[in-house]
Amino acid sequence: MTNLRKTHPLMKIVNSSFIDLPAPSNISSWWNFGSLLGICLIIQILTGLFLAMHYTSDTMTAFSSVTHICRDVNYGWLIRYLHANGASMFFICLFLHVGRGLYYGSYMYLETWNIGVLLLFAVMATAFMGYVLP
């Protein structure tokens, strides 16, 4: 008797996606940080756009625009805190992602590793421009 999950057309799709997944069986939770980085980046971009709609960078009105965001904008305080804490979470996930790469020897793949190092420097430069310089 043949196995139904390997012969039925719809069950074959489910089988190849969930049951016989072509992934190593020893994959751990350390491999989730790439997707967590993507989620943190999307949160940063969206909250940054909403904050930029109400922020004024003029030295005379910058503080009052931040208080306007926190007091007058609907859930502005939440957007501001999500943006601030999302940046911290982004860098925690980023450093854990790099640490996982070091632990599992991903530096042996030179082209991929060098692109990752360039991305790390670009992220750090962007964070410097957005946090330290204003």
Curated annotation (Swiss-Prot):
PANTHER family linked: CYTOCHROME B (PTHR19271:SF16)
Cofactor remark: Binds 2 heme b groups non-covalently.
Residue sites binding heme b b566 per the record: 97
Entry similarity comment: Belongs to the cytochrome b family.
GO biological process: mitochondrial electron transport, ubiquinol to cytochrome c
Name this polypeptide is given: Cytochrome b
Organism this protein belongs to: Sorex hosonoi
An MF annotation (GO) of this entry: metal ion binding
Subunit structure of this chain's protein: The cytochrome bc1 complex contains 11 subunits: 3 respiratory subunits (MT-CYB, CYC1 and UQCRFS1), 2 core proteins (UQCRC1 and UQCRC2) and 6 low-molecular weight proteins (UQCRH/QCR6, UQCRB/QCR7, UQCRQ/QCR8, UQCR10/QCR9, UQCR11/QCR10 and a cleavage product of UQCRFS1). This cytochrome bc1 complex then forms a dimer.
Gene Ontology terms: cellular component: mitochondrial inner membrane
Additional remark text: Heme 1 (or BL or b562) is low-potential and absorbs at about 562 nm, and heme 2 (or BH or b566) is high-potential and absorbs at about 566 nm.
Localization: Mitochondrion inner membrane
Record Gene3D superfamilies: Cytochrome Bc1 Complex, Chain C
Gene it is expressed from: MT-CYB
